[in-house]
């Protein structure tokens, strides 16, 4: 069975992505590999993708886009600043940054800011306050001692930056993701539904089934989460930039709100940034980091993400092992009283959602040790994941891509099996395989969700003891060429 039900996303650099390394992370609990387009080129991506697929067809690959970000331009050497220093800021991507003038990549930067506005550079390490606004530049006062290097992030809390959702580099990377059949695209700085639809238009034009994860990194994204969830396939709570764009004391509350919204929408949610930050350079986490992981699970997140810990840290395998152990314990310790109740829409005839809820509820009343579903699209498995059952969901997938699309969903263990003539044969073959692999015992009780009619949504829930079901295997034949499960 699963090491833990919470999924783990790990950022891997093309500088450290050999097969043995990825295999160690996978064995430690890795489910999804994240590729950061800001730090690698095509040659590096080629190597990383090939090595991930060599290790396992179950590891999903998630590619980040840059989105509408603002950065400082290049400079000759790091520049030290002290509190009280005055410096000009201009919006010119082609101008080099100097001690006297910081240039940023957004041409209309001066226009969008006003006197009194705060500019946070390099994740807030360098803070500026606008003291004077001119037609072609801002005059700012430095608030703290810091050293500025090339191409650092620029955030302006509370100010809407009117940049297009997709850069030309993003478009090229999306086309590359389509070519390589990547599983997820995580789009940065999503502000509204249109930001997601811009990517969907590209994917649809190429008949791609890549899933889109919306990275929520500013107040506008938080405010528009409902409309974003209508069109996105999942959400990443990117606490790094979010903690700069909004007051940091609000982050725990926003995290809890976004997780709840995603569960109600039955879409996976990832909590990211500094989960085990000290393990970049230390073999053990702080107690606060352990508690942070546990609290994200108590809030009911689907997945947790590691960034620098696995991309360039000294203890990448230990970080994944630590996260796996903490997650497994937190799943045991979480209180059922805090489960998020998902109401069923009285005006909806969504049989899949209804049966998924009953299947998970049955695990609390009967000795059911797993819920099995055969799935073409993964929809039924994602519905089951939303109800956060105690026991795993075993999703038998017709396509390997579906298997990887479920790599972010809580408690779902996806297994690939070639499509069979009918659903019951599929079910019995799955039971035999799970018995052979030691995942189930003959006396275990299992729930089975499927469809009795070709081309329809999930239509029945069946509960059996494994050995009893297999005794009657030859007597049960139900057609299932389902494309909706």
Where are these regions (language model features)?
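Non-catalytic helical/linker scaffolds that mediate oligomerization, partner binding
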Residues: 1-485
């Amino acid at each position: 069975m699963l090491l833990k039900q919470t999924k783990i996303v790990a950022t891997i650099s093309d500088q450290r992505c050999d097969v043995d390394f990825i295999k160690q992370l996978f064995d430690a609990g890795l489910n999804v590999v994240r590729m950061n387009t800001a730090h690698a080129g095509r040659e590096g991506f080629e190597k990383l993708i090939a090595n991930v697929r060599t290790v396992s067809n179950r590891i999903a690959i998630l590619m980040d886009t840059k989105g509408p970000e603002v950065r400082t331009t290049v400079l000759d050497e790091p520049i030290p600043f002290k509190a009280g220093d005055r410096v000009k800021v201009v919006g010119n991507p082609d101008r080099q940054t100097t001690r006297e003038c910081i240039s940023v990549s957004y041409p209309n930067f001066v226009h969008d800011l006003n006197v009194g506005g705060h500019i946070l550079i390099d994740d807030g390490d360098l803070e500026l306050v606008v003291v004077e606004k001119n037609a072609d530049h801002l005059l700012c006062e430095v608030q703290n001692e810091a050293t500025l290097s090339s191409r650092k992030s620029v955030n302006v809390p509370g100010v809407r930056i009117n940049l297009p959702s997709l850069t030309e580099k993003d478009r090229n990377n999306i086309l590359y993701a389509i070519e390589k059949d990547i599983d997820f695209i995580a789009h940065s700085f999503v502000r509204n539904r249109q930001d997601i639809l811009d990517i969907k238009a590209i994917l649809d034009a190429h008949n791609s089934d890549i899933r889109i994860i919306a990275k929520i990194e500013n107040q506008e994204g938080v405010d528009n989460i409902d409309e974003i969830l209508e069109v996105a396939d999942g959400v990443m709570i990117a606490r790094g930039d979010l903690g700069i764009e909004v007051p940091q004391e609000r982050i725990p509350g926003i995290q809890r709100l976004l997780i709840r919204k995603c569960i109600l929408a039955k879409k996976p949610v990832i909590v990211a940034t500094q989960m085990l930050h000290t393990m970049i350079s230390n073999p053990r986490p702080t107690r606060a980091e352990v508690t942070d992981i546990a609290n994200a699970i108590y809030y009911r997140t689907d997945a947790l993400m590691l960034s620098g810990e696995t991309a360039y840290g000294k203890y990448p395998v230990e970080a994944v092992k630590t996260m796996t152990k903490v997650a497994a314990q937190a799943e045991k310790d979480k209180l059922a009283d805090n489960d998020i109740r998902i109401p069923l829409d009285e005006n909806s005839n969504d049989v899949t959602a209804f049966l998924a809820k009953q299947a998970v509820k049955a695990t609390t009343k009967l000795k059911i040790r797993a819920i099995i579903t055969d799935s073409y699209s993964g929809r039924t498995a994602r519905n089951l994941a939303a109800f956060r059952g105690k026991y795993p969901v075993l999703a038998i997938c017709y396509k390997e891509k579906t298997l990887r699309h479920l790599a972010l969903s809580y408690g779902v263990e996806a297994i690939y099996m070639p499509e069979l003539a009918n659903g019951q044969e599929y079910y019995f073959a799955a039971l035999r395989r799970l018995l052979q692999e030691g995942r189930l015992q003959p006396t275990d009780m299992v729930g089975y969700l499927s469809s009795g009619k070709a081309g329809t949504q999930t239509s029945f829930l069946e509960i059996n003891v494994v050995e009893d079901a297999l005794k009657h295997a030859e007597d049960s034949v139900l057609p299932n060429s389902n494309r909706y499960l």
